[in-house]
């Protein structure tokens, strides 16, 4: 049986440009979720579409080091670096959770040069909802 002829420069093999479209975003929302185990920073546009995100785990911190303030600072810096290149100048910050990385992430956001219109704490508070887990005995 004859071998099929390979076409050089066929459409399948070539890639035209990048899939991610780069758009200018003047204003956005920075969501910081700080738990005791990890800190996740998500940057969205005003409509809520995710532009960039980072967490302490993706920055290379593993285990208990993910919950540290330094890990949160690094995660916030990584998430914001991408959106500053896309032209973001103003942002709102929404912080959720009781973790140690709350203040460190906010400090890193302030240092990035983005003007903050407001900082809001959106930590969910139960009105006597579910029973909390038992206290630790160490």
UniProtKB/Swiss-Prot annotation:
InterPro entries: Ribosomal_uS11 (IPR001971), Ribosomal_uS11_bac-type (IPR019981), Ribosomal_uS11_CS (IPR018102), Ribosomal_uS11_sf (IPR036967). GO terms for molecular function: rRNA binding; structural constituent of ribosome. Residues 9-23 have a biased composition (Basic residues). Keywords: Chloroplast, Plastid, Ribonucleoprotein, Ribosomal protein, RNA-binding, rRNA-binding. Pfam families: Ribosomal_S11. GO terms for cellular component: chloroplast; ribonucleoprotein complex; ribosome. It is found in: Plastid, Chloroplast. NCBIfam families: PRK05309.1, uS11_bact. Part of the 30S ribosomal subunit. Belongs to the universal ribosomal protein uS11 family. This is Small ribosomal subunit protein uS11c. The gene is rps11.
């Amino acid at each position: 049986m004859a071998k099929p002829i390979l076409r050089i420069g066929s459409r399948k093999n070539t890639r035209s440009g990048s899939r991610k479209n780069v758009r200018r975003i003047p204003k956005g929302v920075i969501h910081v979720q700080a738990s005791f185990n990890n800190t996740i920073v998500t940057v969205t546009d005003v409509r809520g579409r995710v532009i960039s995100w980072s967490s302490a785990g993706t920055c290379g911190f593993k285990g208990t080091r993910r919950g540290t303030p330094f890990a949160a600072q690094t995660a916030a810096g990584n998430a914001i670096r991408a959106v500053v290149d896309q032209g973001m100048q103003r942002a709102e910050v929404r912080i959720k959770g009781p973790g140690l990385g709350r203040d460190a992430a906010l400090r890193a956001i302030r240092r990035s040069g983005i003007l903050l219109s407001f900082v809001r704490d959106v930590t969910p508070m139960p009105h006597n909802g579910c029973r909390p887990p038992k206290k630790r005995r160490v």
